[in-house]
Structure formats: C-alpha cells, structure tokens
Amino acid sequence: MLANPATKYVPFAPFARDFSERTWPSRRITQPPIWMSTDLRDGNQSLIEPMSVERKLRFFEQLVKIGFKEIEVGFPSASQTDFDFVRKLVDEKRIPDDVTIIVLTQSREDLISRTVEAAAGAKQAIVHLYNACAPAFRKVVFNMSKDEIKQIAISGTQWVKQYMAQHPETQWRYEYSPEVFSTTEPEFALEVSNAVADVWQPTPECKMVLNLPATIEATTPNLYADQIEWMHKNLARRDSIVLSVHPHNDRGTAVAAAEFAVMAGADRIEGCLFGSGERTGNVDLVTLALNLYTQGVHPGLDFSDIDEVRRCAEYCNQLPVHPRHPYAGDLVFTAFSGSHQDAIKKGFAQQKPDAVWEVPYLPIDPADLGRSYDAVIRVNSQSGKGGVSYLLEQEHGLVLPRRLQIEFSRAIQRVTDETGREVTADDVHTIFNREYLEQHSPWKLVRHRIDGDPAGGQGKQFSIQVELDYNGERRVVTGSGDGAISAFVAALGIPVRIMDYHEHAIGTGTDTRAASYVELRVGDSATGFGVGIDRDIVTASFQAVLSAVNRHLANGVTVTESETAQAA
C-alpha cells in the first residue's frame, strides 16, 4: 500500500457543489419497491461455471415461488445457452401470466434483433438496453465524445422500437441503463436519459424503466442517494418513468445504497439473492427484503423457508452462502457469548405469543424464516451459564436453579478450555450426567421406606429406613426428622446442612419424571449441588442429596471414620 494514497486515488464528487436540496434523509420506507432479480443474468455471468439450462430453470422456478414479478432471464445475444433458455421458457409456457421477463442487450442492431427474437411470444417482456456513459469509458474504452455516446443510446432505442413492432403478440416494455451511472456526470446522465425517453415516448399508462446502476460503487451511500434524488427531481418525464437502481457492492455498502436510493425516489431495485454478481456482487435482495420485514413492512417476497432458498442458490450458483450472511447463514441466529446467551434465554422466557418481538440480539424471529431455535444457543469457551442452561432446558427439560447454572457452567468451561472446541447439546447433557447423575460413589441409594406422609405437615415427625450401597457394601440406616429429606440426612449420619432445594416435573402424563436439585454443605465445606431424577419425587430428592455428598467427597471434603460409622 502507498504511504500517501492521494497520489494515486482521488475521491469521486458527483456534484460541483453540495447538493443542499436533498430531502431523502428524513424519509422512511413504508412500502416495498418493485423487485427485479438479475440472478439469471448478472449473477450467472459472474460464475466460474455459468448455469446450465437445467440449473437456470430450477432457479427461475424458485424466484417465481418467492414472488418475483420481474426476472432478468439472460443475455440471449451473447450466449446460445441463454438464448435457448429464454426460448424454453416462452415455448413451454413456463412464465406465469403475472411475471415479466427481462432480456439484456447492447446497443447494436444485430444484437437487438437477436434479443427480441429470443423473447418474442412471451405474454410480456422488457428489453433492457445499456451503454456506458462515464468519462473513463468514453475516453479509455470507446474514445468517443459525449454526443457519440448519446447517439449510441438513441440509435439503440430506435432499433428496439423497430424490432418490437414486428412481434405485436408480446406486450413489450423498455428499460434503459446509462451504465456506470455512479461515476457519470449527473448532467450528462440526465441528458442521455431524457434523449432516450424522447425517442421512446413513455406515458403514465405505459412507463419506461430508467435504471441508474452503481456499476462500480464509487462513493458513500449518501452520495449515491443524492445522485438518485437529483435525477428524480430533474427528469423531464418523471411521471412516465419507473426509476430503478442497480447497486453493486464494491465498497461493501450496496444494501445501504439501495435503501437510501428508495428514500431518494427510486421505485425499483435490481439485485441478486445473497448478493451474487460481478466482482463483489450485486445488492442482496434477501437482506433488503428482510430488513423491510423487521421494520413491519411486508416486502412482497416470501422467505418463510430461507433454507430452501439458500440451498437452491448454492446449487445453481455452485457457491456457498457465508455462515455469517445476514438472515440466511448457518450462524446468524447463533450466540456463543455468555452474556448474549443469557439475554436471549431471558428474552425467550418473557416473549409472549403474538406480542411485538423483543428478544435481545435477534432482530427477527427465526421461526418466521422457517428456522428452529435449536441452533440459537451453542456453547464454546466464550459461553456462560445462560447458554448452557438453555440447552439443557430446551433439549432435556432440565430447569436449573441459578446457582447450579453458575456451578455447572464451570464444568463446561473446563471442557471447552481443554479441548478448544464447541460442545454440542448432546455433549452438555453427557457432561451434566457425568457431573451430577452418575455420582454413585461411595454412596448409592438402593431402596427406602418412610413411615409418615412424604408431603409433610407442621410438627410431624418422619421415620425412615434406607438401604444404601457404600463402595459395594450394603448398609441399612434409619433416621427421623420433620420432613422426608431431613429424616434421610439424619439417617446418613454425616454433617450435612441443606442450603436450598428445588424440584420440577419433566414431561407430562405417564412419562412424567421428577427432577430434584439440592444445594448442601458437608461440614464446613463450600456449598455444592446434587441432582436426582426419578419417577418418584422423594426418591429423586434422596438421589440429589447423595449426588451432592458424593461430589463433595470426590472434591476432597473429608468425613471422619466415626461419622461414616454412624451410617453402618
């Protein structure tokens, strides 16, 4: 890179003075633009291996299913494959009556004739003619004057009218693009556009499409919006023109440029699904449409099965959609960060059906796009208690008390730090089982018998007889207390203090099980949790006590021989 890039690059300034008449910044988008997909033309021509007719047909059908009413289907004068594909659509009557196909051509008579021939017979079609108008193209590519460039556009428009007239069975419309509008002097772009409209003679009932492409994205999006608003206000036949934009993504701001352009007066947007197209791609129509959706404006396009749309695009383009791609990527609804997971978990818990969507970190409900919530929270070394507990609750119905969430997250953290990898929901459950439910040494519950009501009652004493396995040795102990758990602890004969207790049901009906969570202290040790799960709530609570005691002992808490002997 140069130490001083100003010696090689200069900023593009579309206006000699500041365009202070702008009004677009205060506007809002309250209805969708006309959408035109150019996946089968601009998207296709940018592929290493252009689509076969079979792949183009599959993509076309997907675009129709999504709801596109204008689809650019090819460049038939430049490719026999494109010509054959357009004819297949027309001859086999594959174009719905409410869909208009668009065919692109350069401004040469033989190419225009071939283009019209390709689309002739369709119920409705648009011929899209373009020629470059920017200074660099006039000087470097064509070595032509402004008048010569303008004449190319005028002549091309005249030829289009001539050849369309030979096929009255089709309802024809016309689209003109001053290519590289983004770096063309606004006054010259206006001059050429008005000259083309003078030849075409559009009316409010039969409008011409004037497309203003950011063929090369050369400025910040606000300057592109200024250019669009200036054209919008100065076109001679504005009421007879559909003002269209075609932003490319060279600077990475095509979506913003398109949104600003609509605010500035554009009626129509051309682009591709997932931003396919030359170089860095065209504007992404999926992102644009779903940005509108998240603002309460239905885009008129259906992405309720976003994964199907993505699979189709990946197959037809032979290119993957990035896992972080807005709305459609594998990871866009996934949180690894602990604080994010905690906020999402709380948001899901508070979100009411049919209420305004207010789940933190998720700008859209994944279910609206056909996504499940399974991958919303995933666990790695950056995760915290919220994500871990969410997975256990969603996948296994375990609702952990807050302090247990914190304690168990440390066990997960140890695993992720040691392995450096993500742990799945199944991994989390396996670690939970190992940490809490498989702690059977040295104490394991065999059976018990209680004299009294396990539900308890004020002032009521319970007697219990418990059979335990202590390191393979069977022992029978007895105890009493004012509740089942206190009687069980008394029978153990170990200095245990119950600090907290939680329980809940897992499942419903005949498959219901009880989950018990006990926080206790052995002697003067720190507190720790144990967990028990059983069809019987009392059995589950006893298992939870033994789970906690065994975990304490495994972590180095000692119990004297006399204390252990009391349980003999």
From Swiss-Prot:
It comes from the Bacteria. Mg(2+) binds at residues 42, 246, 248, 282. Keywords: Amino-acid biosynthesis, Branched-chain amino acid biosynthesis, Cytoplasm, Leucine biosynthesis, Magnesium, Metal-binding, Transferase. InterPro entries: 2-isopropylmalate_synth_dimer (IPR013709), AIPM/Hcit_synth_CS (IPR002034), Aldolase_TIM (IPR013785), IPM_Synthase (IPR005668), LeuA-like_post-cat (IPR054692), LeuA_allosteric_dom_sf (IPR036230), LeuA_N_DRE-TIM (IPR039371), PYR_CT (IPR000891). Residues 33-307 form the Pyruvate carboxyltransferase domain. Residues 439-568 are annotated as: Regulatory domain. SMART domains: LeuA_dimer. One of its GO terms (molecular function) is magnesium ion binding. It is found in: Cytoplasm. Pathway: Amino-acid biosynthesis; L-leucine biosynthesis; L-leucine from 3-methyl-2-oxobutanoate: step 1/4. Its EC number is 2.3.3.13. SUPFAM superfamilies: 2-isopropylmalate synthase LeuA, allosteric (dimerisation) domain (SSF110921), Aldolase (SSF51569), post-HMGL domain-like (SSF89000). Belongs to the alpha-IPM synthase/homocitrate synthase family. LeuA type 2 subfamily. Catalyzes the condensation of the acetyl group of acetyl-CoA with 3-methyl-2-oxobutanoate (2-ketoisovalerate) to form 3-carboxy-3-hydroxy-4-methylpentanoate (2-isopropylmalate). Homodimer. This is 2-isopropylmalate synthase. It comes from Bordetella petrii (strain ATCC BAA-461 / DSM 12804 / CCUG 43448). The lineage of its organism: Bacteria, Pseudomonadati, Pseudomonadota, Betaproteobacteria, Burkholderiales. The gene is leuA.
